[in-house]
Regions:
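Structured adenosyl-cofactor binding patch, chiefly the S-adenosyl-L-methionine
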Residues: 28, 33, 128-129, 150-156, ...
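Short glycine/serine/threonine-rich phosphate/pyrophosphate-binding segments
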Residues: 118-122, 213, 238
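Short basic, glycine-rich beta-strand/loop surfaces that mediate nucleic-acid
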Residues: 76-87, 153-157, 161-163, 199-207
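Active-site/ligand-binding-proximal alpha/beta "capping" segment
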Residues: 183-233, 237
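Short, ordered loop/turn segments at secondary-structure junctions
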Residues: 46-47, 66-69, 139-142, 188, ...
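N-terminal positively charged helical leader segments and presequences
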Residues: 1-99
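RNA substrate-binding interface of SAM-dependent RNA methyltransferases
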Residues: 101-190
Length: 251
């Protein structure tokens, strides 16, 4: 039975007008995602050629020049001539999402207090590249779905389940019950990540570059590991650390 405490909170992702997803890769992924409701597309002739009329399907669309697309978006947004006005994706439940995946070699990323959408988006992009089953965040102090997050993820926001929960510690408890070995990635971890020789399902916990993984969250991990780096550098950017760790776990 599903734990009611982990039920996704009733918190809207976006304003009533919807959010704007922009850029060729994010737009293609959104158009291909059956869970994504798209209200309209605004794009240039060149972007239409890149995306293809077939992928647009029956989505209401308008052909404009690049400046018209820019006016719909935050200043400086790199849109490559396309913007989609969308609804936020329906909320996902962690246990239900994992029930639809085959156990044995799954990886779930758990992000603790990583609030920068560029970092979170880059982590999603790596998650897609390495076949991660889900990325889990807390419903506070984590990026909500947005055009910036989608752009940084380069399409992965619409391909990797991005799940927010009320409490990360309880989510880690649930992952433990489901058979996941929970690893905190931290500079003071007990051994290099490569030395763990871990088989089976893994939940990898990443913390913010400033404060790291919170104490209570770390206490819900089975072990802590680190990525060896040159002593002249204190740490890696968290999105770079995620990519290195995922490569190591999949190697």
């Amino acid at each position: 039975m599903r734990d009611a405490r982990n039920k996704p909170p009733h918190r809207p992702h976006v304003a009533a007008a919807g959010l704007w997803i922009y850029g060729l890769h994010p737009a293609r992924a959104a158009l291909a995602n059956k869970r994504r409701r798209i209200m309209r597309a605004v794009l240039t002739t060149r972007a239409l050629e890149e995306i293809g009329a077939g992928l647009l399907g029956r989505v209401k669309h308008q052909i404009v020049d690049g400046e018209a697309v820019s006016r719909l978006l935050p200043q400086g947004a790199v849109h490559q001539g396309v913007a989609l006005q969308c609804e936020g994706l329906p909320r996902r439940d962690l246990e239900e999402t994992l029930a639809a995946t085959a156990p044995g070699a799954r990886i779930v990323l758990v992000l603790d207090q990583i609030s920068d959408p560029h970092n979170a988006g880059a982590i999603l992009r790596s998650a897609a590249a390495f076949g991660v089953a889900a990325v889990v965040v807390q419903d506070r102090n984590a990026p909500s779905e947005s055009g910036v997050l989608a752009k940084a993820a380069s399409g992965a926001l619409d391909t990797v389940p991005y799940i927010d929960v009320v409490n990360l510690s309880r989510a880690l408890e649930k992952l433990g019950e489901l058979g996941f070995w929970r690893i905190a990635l931290a500079g003071d971890g007990g051994q290099p990540l490569a030395d763990g020789k871990i088989k089976g399902d893994i939940a990898l916990v990443l913390g913010s570059e400033g404060s790291g993984i919170r104490r209570l969250v770390r206490e819900h991990c089975d072990t802590a590991a680190f990525i060896p780096i040159d002593s002249r550098m204190e740490s890696l950017n968290v999105s770079n650390a995620a990519a290195v760790a995922l490569y190591e776990l999949r190697r």
